[in-house]
Amino acid sequence: MSSVYADVIVDITNEKLDRTFQYKVPPELTGEISPGTAVQIPFGNGNRTITGYVLSVGNEPKYPQDRMKAILAVQKDAATVETKLIALAAWMRHTYGSTMIQALKTVLPVKVKARGKETREIALLADPARCEELLENYRKKNYKARIRLLNALLAQPVLPGPVVSKKLKITADTLHVMEEQGVLEIRRTSTWRNPVSDAAGRTTAGKPNEQQQAVVDGIRKEWEGQNRPCLIRGVTGSGKTLVYMELMEQVLSEGKQVIVLIPEIALTYQNVERFCAQFGTRVTVVNSRMTPSERADQMERARRGEVSIMIGPRSALFAPFPDLGLIVIDEEHETSYKSEVTPRYHARETAVRRAGLEHAHVVMGSATPSVDASYACETGAYALFRMDARYGNVALPSVWIADMREELQMGNRSILSGKLREEIEKRLEKKEQVVLFLNRRGYAGFVSCRACGHVMKCPHCDVSLTAHNNGKLVCHYCGYETPQVHACPSCGSPYIGGFCAGTQQIEQNVKKLFPKARVLRMDGDTTKTKNSYEEILSSFAAGEADILIGTQMIVKGHDFPNVTLVGALAADLSLNAVDYRAGERTFQLLTQAVGRAGRGEKPGMAVIQTYHPEHYSIQTAAEQDYGAFYEKEMDYRRLMGYPPAAELLAIHGAGEDEAHLTQAMEYIRRYLIRIRGNREVQIIGPASEAVSKINDLYRMAVYVRAPQEEVLAGLREKLERYIEINKGFRTVYLQFDFSRKY
């Protein structure tokens, strides 16, 4: 028998160790080791025992055998990486700039091996004649426990484990001896926890209407042809979920499996229940509220083929299905699909890659697709399908834009405009419900004038300046600074500063204005406990409250038929976030918020309160006109050179010593200027991050902008080598983050 060797990646995150090391596979472990297996290996000069993951197995040694170490053992309690996911991890490592072990741990959704709940049965093997001989022998030697068990098995040849251990008082040692003698066998089976109950029964979602069927047929035709990723752009309430389910039925009928990605914030009972009602216990769910062992159980059920549909947030993308057929990405525009830890992968890009590796399909849906996804449709990389009418031809809500500058001029300094207050009173009289949405997304201390709406912005980057405690206004892209202002430079008004109102303050004001109204608040403070999120939504859905106040979590895919009014408070907060995507985020949030109104039989209305009523993000959200928004946003991106009009690489640095970090990031800037070559490559920064310190680590960034991704990839590789040989970076933690075209 020829020798077997394994290429192993060590479980140490270090650029210098980011390669495979070859080990001998001992003969006794040959049958247990395959690509993806976690193993114990001796490593380094001291041969300390560490964990590694096998990437490949072969019969060709790369080094002399007398120099090669051997694998010590298979790590029994560790999860195994599926072979298909190893290839995906290799792509992520190259694409997003990480070590292979970081990429492997990302595609390994759970770090521990699933154990399940083991059930045991004791079955009799010996025939009656031999049993008589054994009983006679046991009596002579006074083996009371064996006599008791054998008599019980003669009466009932298969006994449940608990009966044997608890009722008959039989020890594990006795069972082991009798099993060794061939008298009986211990049958062990594992069952896995199932978070989805079939007790409520199955229902069908109904037949697609003409608009939905046209999209289903169009996507099926695309699958038969180019099989490009498909994007469904459907207005809020158009019935995209039913389209997903029709396509899922086809894939399941072919014996394949489906992954459905839903943002964590929208992963509610109401959303998941529709899939469970249609597909029953073929569905399983994972989410962050589960324990690691609960998530491990669901991944094991997927690997064994016990379930066919995995629903979950970003991490569900790595479900180890044996024959994946379809990946659905609901609310494709959601920012939570982008990882904030290395590797900083995007679920959309990674889903497209996984589908390509496994010959599966990708279908995405959103009322407000990301600009990146729409650009991919424009270039022909994705196929676009539109759903412009609500299901059942329900009318879109009417929208009123309240100019808060005019409210101030009329003496109204309340958080609620006169129009919104008037409409709330009408809804309360008619026993209808109201949602008040505080748009705090991306708020990081921007400064604006309440009289004219002027916002202090960077003259170089067109992003909002951030107020700091040292009296400075700072740009977190390029580092530009200017002194804090006490009067508006545009109109001279003293009413200039940051926006301080939070959901708690709004709740207090609303209760004062409407003392008889039943008010619920939903934010980070009220949803800390495990089930509080569902309890608040269920209470509101049941009509136990008249007004629901909250942040972005209340506008994510919830369906409340009795909600006829939505108030979007302070729409400008996300518009002035320190991010070139601020306009896109604002349009998406406002469109989603407006879409919560009038989803039942009663007509809906939305009031958008803003200091910038003329901004295209506000105007197009009010008109629910995605096409107009996309055109104007792309004009802005092209003018400023932001993705998807260009490629952007962010180099994030963190360190305990602020001066040392600043020096290191300046070294990076100078080195990039020296090697960039192409004049079209722009180096921006270094500058402090929007949140400049977290957990005692100072944070800074340098940005590199270029027309092609290949240019940035080449610069990153050179920079990585420069950092590796330069001792000045040893106390600085660096991350690379690409913002691609699609």
Give residue ranges: language-model regions.
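A general secondary-structure junction signal
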Residues: 56-58, 108, 188-190, 438-440, ...
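Accessory, non-ATPase domains that flank or precede helicase/AAA+ motor cores in DNA-metabolism machines
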Residues: 1-366, 378-394, 675-678, 703, ...
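A carboxyl-terminal module marker
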Residues: 670, 674-676, 680-698, 719, ...
